[in-house]
């Protein structure tokens, strides 16, 4: 069955459509939504079966982790005990916004966190009351979708709900930065350019390979 498209342009039905999408997430379904960059696909971050399904639908390698969308920057402390100064500076400057920060975890794995600056996804996170595991709305290796019709074209009956908020604001993906204590590396160039990152950090750290 083709995904249900929920139009968010009508303020009278906006809240109800957010609830419909939230209920879909809570029942293990995949939901597409606009962000301030491109359209994303998401599932509840605490649902392992839904995450497996998202990888399958996306045709994404398990080596490439999903981003975790959080509604408040303070939630970073739920994932890492020590937040490097570099991360604190970037969070203070660019969050909420189009920046994904990858941090080390105690078990030697990593987590990519993003605090988006888009009403729809923020309302959705707050409605489900858990972080959302997310990836761009395209088959792995393809171009990210920038509107609801492109999402449908990419996935059709493979996902469950599409929140149609009109064209994505930036049309380019978020910038992804891996952070160590005093070093960072740009993993993916995106909306926030290298120069803006450098100005923010004021040469207090070293950039490697970017």
Feature roles, as predicted:
Residues 1-210:
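Active-site-adjacent structural elements in enzyme catalytic cores
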């Amino acid at each position: 069955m083709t995904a249900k498209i929920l139009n968010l342009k009508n303020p009278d039905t906006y809240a109800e459509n957010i609830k419909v999408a939230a209920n879909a997430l809570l029942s293990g379904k995949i939901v597409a939504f606009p962000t301030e960059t491109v359209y994303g696909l998401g599932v509840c971050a605490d649902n392992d079966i839904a995450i497996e399904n998202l990888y399958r639908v996306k045709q994404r390698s398990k080596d490439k982790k999903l981003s975790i969308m959080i509604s408040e920057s303070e939630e970073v402390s739920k994932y890492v005990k020590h937040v490097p100064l570099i991360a604190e500076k970037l969070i203070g400057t660019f969050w909420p916004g189009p920046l994904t920060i990858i941090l080390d975890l105690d078990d030697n794995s990593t987590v990519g966190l993003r605090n988006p600056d888009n009403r729809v996804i923020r309302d959705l996170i707050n409605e489900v009351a858990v972080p959302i595991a997310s990836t761009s709305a395209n088959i792995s290796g393809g171009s990210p979708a920038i509107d609801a019709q492109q999402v449908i074209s990419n996935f059709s009956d493979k996902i469950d709900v599409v929140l149609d908020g009109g064209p994505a604001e930036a049309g380019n993906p978020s910038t992804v930065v891996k952070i160590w204590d005093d070093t960072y590396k740009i993993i993916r160039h995106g909306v926030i350019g290298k120069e803006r990152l450098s100005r923010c950090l004021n040469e207090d750290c070293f950039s490697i390979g970017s």
